[in-house]
């Protein structure tokens, strides 16, 4: 009986699901709202039984996953079982039938009932109907099976079923009846599908225009309930919000269900509405994401989604609120400091939306300044052109000094003889200007000893903050009777004399000294100074930090009470003594030598980076900016990419330098240093940035600034500084997202990084994109005129200094190779004439000329020539190359040996006299399928070739599409092919194609749930979905394309196109990558796809073993073709190898999915195999499409649409214009279907209705050239499997297999079958390694059943990594041993070169393998009679 779940039961269920690691999408879809009704623990039998309640019947896959995970998770505690109770008892016949195999597996019954497993029950209400042959069977079944079946289905969550039987009629008559009814069913289905397609087409053509009003109009004054206030079921509520998800679904009843998810940014809610009549449907379908709606209805607990949902009666489209920039035209601000999702895990709004918003507000320009990167530039460039907004390209970079001085006021004084005044100050804050000293202490050090002390409190005449009291231990009471600050400084000045001053972080302490001296009427001190912090960084660069307490611990110096001046001073004195000894030993004898190493080596690591803004004013500046970004990532990366000041000076041309945010050195100096110091620092910059006080409020929170009043004073002083230095002061927003309500996305992202992100140490300020009037309000404290100057006038002025900058080129820049056009033409014609004769057939010459005109005319010849060189090098080195993608559509590529696929129509050609015969009527699918035929003139066999593939599928209808030549090199050869590009072009002209890894939806879901848990929030599912969407797409890391090589022409350099970096900032990686995602520069630079693949490696090994040139292998061998429909040509039966085909281990045809396709289609020709390859790689091409057409007898395998090119070729043969045929092919392959007007053209040219319907279903299609190349490799490998079996298995196990069970393999078929059964019985419980092993064992069984066998691993004959043929057996390599990796395997082989092993001990010592491996080899008899230890001799 269904019970009402408590919150605790639901929460425990969610915890259980998380522990079981059930994917979040499955939980959300099927298990949300479920619970644990009870848990029954049987301690005696060590068993746990869970009674679980779930919303509805689960898919069988999910049921089995739950079962598997429960067993795995509690295997060490108890045996687990569970039963399901479903809240919604509705089920379909398909669901009942899906569970039938599980049911029959779990019931123990007599073998007489085994036939139950081979049939599926019919379902009638709660009755299951089973076919039986007679009354006796019926009685036995009801008596013995009915109850366990009912019990088992109840466990699955179904209602209790009754078992009924149906006695079959005469089998032959029954079969005829079935066939007749099946045929009628098929015809009805086809008719229904055609009618449905027609109906859908008619309905989809109706588009509703105008404001949408579903139901009644909702009055403007009706009370709106904020969504956050909806916490329970309500009878009638009205909400309004932004639509962020829309879905419409046609129900079986004929009604349409609309599902919306909307937000008012206080929360989100799902809204459901059912159509009332046909007139509703166009309006339902016209609701789109991005609209604002008002909805009225009842709020209910939805049992399906397990959440509060509004069932709407009325939905009205409304105009949503939006921020407007109210400033007059021409008086609008320019944002000069803005971050995009390319600021790693920090900003959330896509740059295209930000630029578009600037355009809507009438802003003339907008700057992009991500943290240290330029990766948003390409998207920003496109967005700027679209919105008519000037985009200013910049970076917020990390500036470091080339080296921070160790010594100031340098003097020629002997370090060993000097007297040092080591001092420390405790203060009310960090600012020498706004804060004051409360304690000043010092010691004099000479000859390694403390010779005098100075200590005094100072009265600040203000209460201390709690933070200062806690940090220093100094209280207000301790300062009440202290001397005045001026008095303390005067005494100290007299006491210190002209000795060398020493402090830990001297720039901070000296700031207070100099300001204190000035206020006391004293001169600024010119005493020499040593900074022990920088001295420590110089002497101990390997340490992560050099704080005083850290250094004291390292050098064993006592630090009694850190952050009390006198104790810190004494500790610093002893630290100085020890470090001076080290520095003198390094050869530094005088004070004025201490800075001699400044800026050398990794000095850039020792400074603390300051932010600065860099804006490119021209293309020259952009190139320099790319260099700065590149070198900061390549040469100066330490925790973050750093820009040394000297590097910026070198590449400053065309760049404006701004002071950036509160992390910039000018703002920090204004907070902490004397005005003259600030002026000196600010001289380096071109303009000064100020930000709204609320953007900087975290400084007050962190007590770096006393209050908002002081913060405004600092901003005002920055404005005055600009006036003093005649530098423009600009108001910037430090934008990280578009609207205020987007702040939550950033909070979640920052929170996900925990303590690693310093932003988690304070609340995040509001950093949305502000309008002009919002920004003017922020700076109103400056006065109206000054506010307008910094917000509008000066930002426009900076924008006016920026010229026309182009971060992305408009053209393709290919490498130039002298004579490439002629060489491409000559090479193509030379090869063509060598095959087809000096007088080329018209069809050949026309195709060559057509292609060469496009290739040479558009500057693509060099791309072909480079690809030719790469392939040629691989072929010379002994490795075949497979082509991918559509390059096989190009006959020029075939003639240049870039691909083996010949795209001409199927044909014969005589290898001697060159006579040819072409079949260009579509009657033959592939030249390889033509019957053998001899040349009548020469009486020698014709060569057969041609796959009938149009050139247009490669370079487009106009032949102007940039060639994308993908090549499959051997996996073991791929690194050599990559490095060969460096030989061809030079190391500075080839780069790996960069990639950018962003936050995926599933990861974002984890962030949102984590944030909710950390902040004790209960969030509705709809709100979770909104937050997840807002967090996706933000940059997490960078990487590299597995095979993409970007080539820069030698007349340009990479910085003309993109910055460069190491992948994932992995310093010292073998390859540098493009900084931009390679898609951004795809149309500007040549990208070579040099991919690694197993097939060429297998072919190379087979060639080495057999001596057979793979190119000479026939492609129509009858025995080879047979394996695609059965295993008989291998000399085994289906029963022997548990497989209905012979394609185990054949690339592209060995997977269960494709083997099932082969069983259903029984291909017999090469072209049909190409069809299978295309069908298996497409989306919605086979399942629910071609397979049904073949099953229904509508058409044959060769007639269905298998590859994209088939569409164009077929339609041309049917009479359609080639241009239209190409457009239809492109539309279908992209999943866009066939527009109505094109459908009419197809019908007018007798294209059958089933063909058109099939086109409409397709979402993605495979290129025929790719399929043909794959099949060619597969057929060659299959040839070895049929005719040179042991060679095939040796190559397969060496190259493709990863997991082995050498013990079972060596014992033969029975042992292998037992191991297969053992793994198979585990089902989903099987570990990933076991699943991988299962494939290997299937191959092993097949090999053994063909009469071959495995030996044990042999200590003296086994290879490290390759299976060795020995008669009719294979000797496994060492790395087939469990736990023995390739390096250890090589170590054994290397060790045995030095002579036989004396003992197991000797083997372990010489090979360095583990004792466990030795014991395993011994247990398998691999070590023979090798003794345990070396025998000792007495003489």
UniProtKB/Swiss-Prot annotation:
The keyword Nucleotidyltransferase applies. Pfam families: DNA_pol3_a_NI, DNA_pol3_a_NII, DNA_pol3_alpha, DNA_pol3_finger, HHH_6, PHP, RNase_T, tRNA_anti-codon. PANTHER family: DNA POLYMERASE III POLC-TYPE, DNA POLYMERASE III SUBUNIT ALPHA. InterPro entries: DNA_pol3_alpha_NTPase_dom (IPR011708), DNA_pol3_finger (IPR040982), DNA_PolC-like_N_II (IPR024754), DNA_PolC-type_N_I (IPR028112), DnaE2/DnaE/PolC (IPR004805), DNAPol_HHH (IPR029460), DnaQ (IPR006054), Exonuclease_RNaseT/DNA_pol3 (IPR013520). Residues 420-576 form the Exonuclease domain. One of its GO terms (molecular function) is DNA binding. It is found in: Cytoplasm. GO terms for biological process: DNA-templated DNA replication. It catalyses: DNA(n) + a 2'-deoxyribonucleoside 5'-triphosphate = DNA(n+1) + diphosphate. It is an enzyme of class 2 (transferase). It comes from Bacillus cereus (strain ATCC 14579 / DSM 31 / CCUG 7414 / JCM 2152 / NBRC 15305 / NCIMB 9373 / NCTC 2599 / NRRL B-3711). GO terms for cellular component: cytoplasm. Required for replicative DNA synthesis. This DNA polymerase also exhibits 3' to 5' exonuclease activity. Its EC number is 2.7.7.7. The keyword GTP-binding does not apply. Signal peptide: none annotated. Its main location: cytoplasm. Keywords: Cytoplasm, DNA replication, DNA-directed DNA polymerase, Exonuclease, Hydrolase, Nuclease, Nucleotidyltransferase, Transferase. Belongs to the DNA polymerase type-C family. PolC subfamily. This is DNA polymerase III PolC-type.
